[in-house]
């Protein structure tokens, strides 16, 4: 056998051996800015599961705009679990028969292991003096957000702005619609996802304000330094939930229901909740929520 063929054979044997090391493989289809959360969570769960069952798990991730992700699952992406940032995306899968109709009752807290809220990220010194939603709809302002139709981040921005407009004197659906329309016209572009929006604002330098999850703001501070921007908490915003579900059609086909269920249940464990808090999400565990009082 020549050297080239030997090299190919070695690579193939390595791939077979690597695959054989895992007793099962799970794919988690998740929203864009959850990369860091599950990068930390997966090794933690693998260690727990190995100690409990003796099984080795291979855990894979797929990330993107929440609505794009569920459409990919509906189109054949074989995700064992979905971990999203808006309930209507999981309802979409339930309507397709991929997720149980009562998915929100399968786990505690309506199947949302942690929460967050929406904040404004502005340049150092807040040069345009942004304080609340009305400032962002003013002429000449550029806002950076992901597309409201494709992402939970963008949709929660839309809903928070709508809710704020309704609370104003004389507020009604018509005035809220007009206000949100003005706000969205101030977006020079719609980012593909939450992390893309962060890159657009922080690295490309586009826009006057980035609207994003509170948790993403903390990740920006970690990566870019707190001195390079400021965080503004508007007077009213939506509590963002992050629902999870098992993709029944996939786990039944692969025989991974036991592992997939445990993977999601562990999000509510002390370790899982601590990981959420370490990634700047608001845990459901009241003791941990108190511990991380900066929320």
Residue map of PLM features:
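Sec-exported extracytoplasmic/periplasmic mature domains
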Residues: 42-51, 74-78, 87, 94-98, ...
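Short helix-loop capping/hinge motifs at secondary-structure junctions, enriched
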Residues: 125-131, 150, 163-171, 250-258
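Ligand-binding pocket segment of bilobal, Venus flytrap-like solute-binding proteins
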Residues: 168-235
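N-terminal segment of the mature folded domain
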Residues: 23-151, 289-294
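Extracellular/periplasmic juxtamembrane helices and adjacent flexible linkers that interface
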Residues: 250-295
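Bacterial N-terminal signal peptides
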Residues: 7-19
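Short beta-strand->loop
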Residues: 29-31, 122-124, 142-169, 183-187, ...
């Amino acid at each position: 056998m020549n050297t080239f063929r030997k090299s190919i054979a070695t690579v193939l044997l390595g791939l077979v051996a690597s695959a054989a090391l895992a007793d099962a493989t799970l794919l988690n289809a998740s929203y864009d800015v959850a990369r860091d959360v599950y990068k930390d969570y997966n090794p933690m769960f693998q260690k727990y599961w190995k100690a409990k069952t003796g099984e080795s798990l291979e855990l894979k991730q797929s990330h993107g705009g929440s609505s794009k992700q569920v459409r990919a699952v509906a189109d054949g992406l074989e995700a064992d679990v979905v971990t999203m940032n808006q309930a209507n995306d999981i309802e979409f899968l339930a309507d397709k028969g991929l997720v149980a109709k009562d998915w929100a009752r399968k786990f505690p807290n309506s199947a949302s292991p942690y929460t967050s809220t929406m904040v404004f990220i502005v340049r150092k010194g807040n040069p345009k003096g942004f304080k609340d939603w009305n400032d962002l709809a003013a002429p000449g302002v550029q806002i950076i957000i992901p597309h409201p139709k494709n992402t939970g981040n963008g949709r929660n921005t839309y809903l928070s702005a709508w809710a704020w407009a309704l609370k104003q004197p004389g507020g009604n659906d018509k005035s809220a619609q007009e206000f949100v329309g003005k706000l969205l016209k101030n977006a020079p572009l719609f980012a593909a996802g939450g992390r893309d929006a962060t890159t657009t604002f922080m690295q490309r330098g586009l826009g006057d304000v980035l609207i994003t999850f509170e948790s993403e703001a903390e990740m920006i501070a970690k990566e870019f330094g707190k001195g390079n921007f400021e965080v503004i908490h508007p007077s009213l915003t939506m509590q963002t939930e992050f629902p999870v579900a098992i993709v029944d059609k996939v786990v039944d086909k692969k025989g991974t229901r036991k592992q997939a269920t445990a993977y999601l249940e562990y999000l509510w464990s002390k370790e899982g909740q601590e990981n959420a808090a370490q990634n700047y999400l608001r845990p459901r565990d009241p003791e941990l929520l108190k511990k991380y009082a900066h929320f």
